[in-house]
Amino acid sequence: MSDLKRTPLCAQHLQLGARLVPFGGWEMPLQYSTLTREHRAVRTAVGLFDISHMGKYTLSGPDVLAQIQRLVPSDLARLQPGQAQYTVLLNEQAGIIDDLIFYCRSPEHWVVIVNGATNDKDRRWLAEHLQGVHFDDLTGTHTLLALQGPAAVETLQPLVDIDLARLGRFEHAQVSLAGKPAFLARTGYTGEDGFEIMSLEPEGIALWQSLTAAGVPPCGLGARDTLRLEAAMHLYGQDMDESTTPLEASLGWVIDWDKPDYFGREILLAQKAQGTERRLVGLTVEGRQIARHGYGLFDGEQQVGVVTSGTLTPTVDRPIALAYVGKPFAPIGSRLEVDIRGRRAMATVVKRPFYRRAL
């Protein structure tokens, strides 16, 4: 018998003909039709993802803000109720435990969404370092859906009781959706406009059925990965982990340098002053071969980097990758060779993201 966990929507995925695969301890849909068709649906119109495997918590208490401030380099005190912040959990060595989003409902009440594969680790870390904070794990009782694409607003607006045009990027609200309560955020992992919707299991299943019955195509992990990679969004465990700092991972923008006290601060200040020995960069690769996770990057016979993520992008229609390279090779325009199963292909360091949506 499989030890893989299933989301509450697994029966829906099977009915829609999804191909299920293991992912971070879960059995998740890889695709329903084809990866390219699902990818292009999100880029041109709208698509629906089940991301209920992601960890979902609420944190509350009079001292909760001060407690969570110690764990991240972003200044969460800047957030107003209804705003959200993408950031990273850091250990004492400034290594990235996970990337996650904090949603401020009030200074005493927060919603937190973490990666599914790191849910258990994150929960243990938070329990160890949050004292006197009420922690409620919603992962087993709530679904999380992502409706993504340029048509997301017009698709969702008839079902919700607020004007979605007034909900800005990285803002959230408690809403009535199809007559039922839901937590709605204008966030996503595709590089497109869209929403992530958390609700109790029965309401989430009903919403999924309603949207797919209305013609919204379901999309799987395959398209989610190519979409996020075009947008140069990191995947934890591939593009960063506890051995990398935010500056090495090109996530310096999440750091508030005036913030006085958090795990790893002195290490990050030293890296800011001295620079890092390696950095995550974007690459385009000549030809049609894909530079995949773990492939080496070379300057002549010297290995100077390693690929962390790569794909043949449906939108740009060329191989792209994220990779760590040594500092001398990080500038835009640097030329390297990637070893693809014993053959070399030329790669160029380029500006990220590889795709940026029209505003």
Swiss-Prot record:
The protein's Enzyme Commission number: 2.1.2.10
Transmembrane segments: none
A Gene Ontology cellular-component term: glycine cleavage complex
Catalysed conversion reaction: N(6)-[(R)-S(8)-aminomethyldihydrolipoyl]-L-lysyl-[protein] + (6S)-5,6,7,8-tetrahydrofolate = N(6)-[(R)-dihydrolipoyl]-L-lysyl-[protein] + (6R)-5,10-methylene-5,6,7,8-tetrahydrofolate + NH4(+)
GO molecular function term, any single one: transaminase activity
Alphabetical keyword list: Aminotransferase, Transferase
GO biological process terms on file: glycine decarboxylation via glycine cleavage system
Statement: the UniProt record of this protein carries the keyword Transferase: yes
Top class in the EC scheme: transferase
Pfam families assigned to the protein according to its UniProt record, in alphabetical order: GCV_T (PF01571), GCV_T_C (PF08669)
Subunit and partners: The glycine cleavage system is composed of four proteins: P, T, L and H.
Function as written in the Swiss-Prot or TrEMBL entry: The glycine cleavage system catalyzes the degradation of glycine.
Family statement drawn from the similarity comment of this UniProt entry: Belongs to the GcvT family.
Record-given protein name: Aminomethyltransferase
Organism the protein comes from: Gloeobacter violaceus (strain ATCC 29082 / PCC 7421)
